[in-house]
């Protein structure tokens, strides 16, 4: 992934445009500055069941993270692809040589060591670590969490409907995780950075599996009565140039792009905005990434203007400006 892609992802996931060209600000990676959308939702809405509230699959989205919220709001990254026959979530199972009795002894030993080390006192850092341990233990011992991640147990016809592709099985896994209580699932799919041979890449590798997976997810959520309570957003970090380059590809373009919303209180079957005949620039009121994040957080019941203080005491709003895209709301 090139620097511009990473910078674009940071902007899309946090709403804050990086003001440093090389992805670094005085040696600090930019995913350590502002919290990403998933981390905001994780902090504001919290856990709901044993599964982590914020999950990324099949790999980290990149350029987004917990920022000044701290590591407890970082995503749980699966980093294996559910389309693989051997798909298994790392660290989800207790070691084979540790039976239930031994596991309980280890847990009591850890609790005793924590109490001794704290000297009967519990500061903020100690309490945070204790929360880590408790959530980790809940994850590895929860039958519900194991069931949610066990995509191999899904009905074969359902798996085929989503498509036996990375985006298909990631979308199906996302539905299972939302059912189990997860708040935010981030899915990354392939490389749409088609600087070379754009049309073949879209026609054969990118569009068909995405179309199948997305339509299956919407239908599945609707049939299960989940769509009105689940917001689905499909987007990239930028658009592509209207003009084809010398390699039959399209380059980076930040002036115009499309985003798809479904469910979660949005209005179905609605096209908002328009562009010129070459899709170069909007011909109606343009919307910013801040408008987009403002709308998403509002639909999730979160105040996008809420102020947090960084560790240095600097007041920072969740979203730096923006307003609701009212035409989108049902």
Regions from the language model: what does each represent?
Residues 4-330:
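Ligand-binding pockets and gating/stacking loops
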